[in-house]
Amino acid sequence: MANLRDIRKKIGSVKNTQKITHAMKLVSTSKLRKAEEVARNSRAYALKLDAVFDDVLSKMKNQGIKDIQSKYFRELERLEIKKVDIIFITADKGLCGGFNANTIKKVLACTNEYQEKDIKVRLRGIGKKGNEYFSFNGIEVLDKINDLSSMPNYERAQEFMQKVVEDYLNGKTDKVVIIHNGFKNMIIQEIRVKTILPIGHHIIHQNSQPSEAQETITSEPSGSEDEILDSLAKKYVEYSLYYALIDSLAAEHSARMQAMDTATNNAKDLVKNLTISYNKARQEAITTELVEINAGVEALK
């Protein structure tokens, strides 16, 4: 009977867990719909901003303007990279499958790749899970912020990027890369690595799919070339981080929805197996009692 009580307790415990994971799945599904819409709208703006850059750079190139003084712009092929800053974005919470682990693995892989080329790497972290991992393993993270990935905010992203841009313009780093998990569809997330500084004539190809058409910007900007580029570059860099945060959040909700759906299904299977074990143990207990009764009756004859 003790075994039966234990199995009943396990069944009750698993059913309670199943209710929790199912509720979390519903919450993540609801949040995902909202995050997906925001990400879709933000991506449209990001692609438009990319188109502006690409058009301005094309016009300057066609006009023979090669000596761009703006420090935001460099040709990566001609630039000797000695120092790289990696901005990584992870979630503040867990229970989202391999979402955080995949991002961390990519950060470590990129770090090793750069270091093998004698390139110094500095990390800047957004997201509690990633920051905790690197802190636990004794890996220095220059800037840490823990509640921005779960609540993307343009002003805070702008503030975070100020120090990054300042270090870049002052020559403390030669290249800035963002690594995060991106939303592809309801069931697929993909790791994205994007170079945001320096900016070269590669923006459209780096950020969009071949099927995504870009509009040509026909308006003529006023002001010097460097002033125009500096103004656009500042907006581009800030929005690149903001969009990455939005994209990462949508991917996080997608991953958590899948993880909770899997956990719920596993709980159902476990309850089914435990119920079979319970019924089998109950039948064995009844059979044992009947045998004992029959043995007692035979002994009295």
Curated annotation (Swiss-Prot):
GO terms for molecular function: ATP binding; proton-transporting ATP synthase activity, rotational mechanism. The lineage of its organism: Bacteria, Pseudomonadati, Campylobacterota, Epsilonproteobacteria, Campylobacterales. Keywords: ATP synthesis, Cell inner membrane, Cell membrane, CF(1), Hydrogen ion transport, Ion transport, Membrane, Transport. Coiled coil: none annotated. The gene is atpG. GO terms for biological process: proton motive force-driven plasma membrane ATP synthesis. It is found in: Cell inner membrane. F-type ATPases have 2 components, CF(1) - the catalytic core - and CF(0) - the membrane proton channel. CF(1) has five subunits: alpha(3), beta(3), gamma(1), delta(1), epsilon(1). CF(0) has three main subunits: a, b and c. The keyword Transcription does not apply. NCBIfam families: ATPsyn_F1gamma (TIGR01146). It is a peripheral membrane protein. GO terms for cellular component: plasma membrane; proton-transporting ATP synthase complex. This is ATP synthase gamma chain. It holds the Pfam family ATP-synt. Belongs to the ATPase gamma chain family. Produces ATP from ADP in the presence of a proton gradient across the membrane. The gamma chain is believed to be important in regulating ATPase activity and the flow of protons through the CF(0) complex. InterPro entries: ATP_synth_F1_ATPase_gsu (IPR035968), ATP_synth_F1_gsu (IPR000131).
